Amino acid sequence: MLENRVKTKQIFIGGVAIGGDAPISTQSMTFSKTADIESTKNQIDRFKLAGADLVRVAVSNEKDALALKELKKVSPLPLIADIHFHYKFALIAAQSVDAIRINPGNIGSKDKIKAVVDACKEKNIPIRIGVNAGSLEKQFDQKYGPTPKGMVESALYNAKLLEDLDFTDFKISLKASDVVRTIEAYRMLRPLVIYPFHLGVTEAGNLFSSSIKSAMALGGLLMEGIGDTMRVSITGELENEIKVARAILRHSGRLKEGINWISCPTCGRIEANLVDMASKVEKRLSHIKTPLDISVMGCVVNALGEAKHADMAIAFGNRSGLIIKEGKVIHKLAEKDLFETFVIEVENLAKEREKSLKD
């Protein structure tokens, strides 16, 4: 059952609202050297085209920190500076970026955290308390180990530090590399704080591994009403992180956008190369943002039943096929004419739906 979202304190990263009633935002992270402004800008442009709302960049040295001023001028997305170990880089970064991410496990003493908070206060930018199971502070790691309890205790401790410094513009993440610890940690912390949550599974692996882990962990939490912004971490192509994240949002009921694809797993009845055709159709219609249920079936046996619930369906037969709109057959065509006609019909339906929404 899809539960109502937990209402959290709202913060802003650039012009993007996080928490409260704001849509759940997606973000990713560049892998270029941040000081290489041209390469980093190119990667950010790719994220923007893929539909990202925010982007995070690594600040590994002073050169990276100083480059943020110029990068901010050309970035099409709000910038988050990712800081580990060296708090002074955060002080430089805060002068240019839209948010700072710190890892409480390695940022240093209370005095160093205070310095970062003061810099963020001055520029009116938020902080992410980014807790990682693999790098907890010594006191929590020794007492609890890399467990959900240890992660939650670290988050609560650092949230209290920021609150004591009269700073409440922050969000929290609790990341582990597996599904169970991730879900348990967020569930445990949710009733204890009002702050927005950044969801993610850290070091989740390649496209296949990460998609499974992220769909289970993030999708489950989203359906429970938990989560305000998210990143799907993938070892692979940049755009895939945003593509998978937005798919998780759609299928967890948190984003009403784009096509919900329905296609059969194939069997001995199919009369066409359904695998290639389904891939071809999905690629050709990937630009559509209108919420539609589209069915691609290898035979009429399944198609007629599935099409009753689909906005548009295509069913392949013996060198011919059907196009079905809202449960009614509108075309019976030779196979060579099916694909282009189907694409046109889906595009026209999307336009009809968009027009009706505006009217």
Swiss-Prot record:
Q: What is the lineage of its organism?
A: Bacteria, Pseudomonadati, Campylobacterota, Epsilonproteobacteria, Campylobacterales
Spell out the NCBIfam families in the cross-references: ispG_gcpE (TIGR00612), PRK00366.1 (NF001540)
User: Which cofactors, if any, are listed as required?
Assistant: [4Fe-4S] cluster
Cross-referenced HAMAP family: IspG
InterPro entries named among the record's database cross-references = Dihydropteroate_synth-like_sf, Enolase-like_C_sf, IspG_bac, IspG_bac-typ, NO2/SO3_Rdtase_4Fe4S_sf
Q: Where does [4Fe-4S] cluster bind?
A: 264, 267, 299, 306
Record family assignment: Belongs to the IspG family.
Please provide, alphabetically and separated by semicolons, the GO molecular function terms listed in this UniProt record: 4 iron, 4 sulfur cluster binding; 4-hydroxy-3-methylbut-2-en-1-yl diphosphate synthase activity (ferredoxin); 4-hydroxy-3-methylbut-2-enyl-diphosphate synthase activity (flavodoxin); iron ion binding
Sorted keywords for this record are: 4Fe-4S, Iron, Iron-sulfur, Isoprene biosynthesis, Metal-binding, Oxidoreductase
Catalytic activity, as annotated: (2E)-4-hydroxy-3-methylbut-2-enyl diphosphate + oxidized [flavodoxin] + H2O + 2 H(+) = 2-C-methyl-D-erythritol 2,4-cyclic diphosphate + reduced [flavodoxin]
Q: What does this protein do?
A: Converts 2C-methyl-D-erythritol 2,4-cyclodiphosphate (ME-2,4cPP) into 1-hydroxy-2-methyl-2-(E)-butenyl 4-diphosphate.
GO terms classed as biological process: isopentenyl diphosphate biosynthetic process, methylerythritol 4-phosphate pathway; terpenoid biosynthetic process
Q: What is this protein called?
A: 4-hydroxy-3-methylbut-2-en-1-yl diphosphate synthase (flavodoxin)
PANTHER family assigned to the protein according to its UniProt record, in alphabetical order: 4-HYDROXY-3-METHYLBUT-2-EN-1-YL DIPHOSPHATE SYNTHASE, 4-HYDROXY-3-METHYLBUT-2-EN-1-YL DIPHOSPHATE SYNTHASE (FERREDOXIN), CHLOROPLASTIC
- Which pathway does the UniProt entry assign to this protein? Isoprenoid biosynthesis; isopentenyl diphosphate biosynthesis via DXP pathway; isopentenyl diphosphate from 1-deoxy-D-xylulose 5-phosphate: step 5/6
* Cofactor stoichiometry and binding remark: Binds 1 [4Fe-4S] cluster.
Q: Its Enzyme Commission number? A: 1.17.7.3
In its UniProt entry, the species of origin is given as Helicobacter pylori (strain J99 / ATCC 700824)
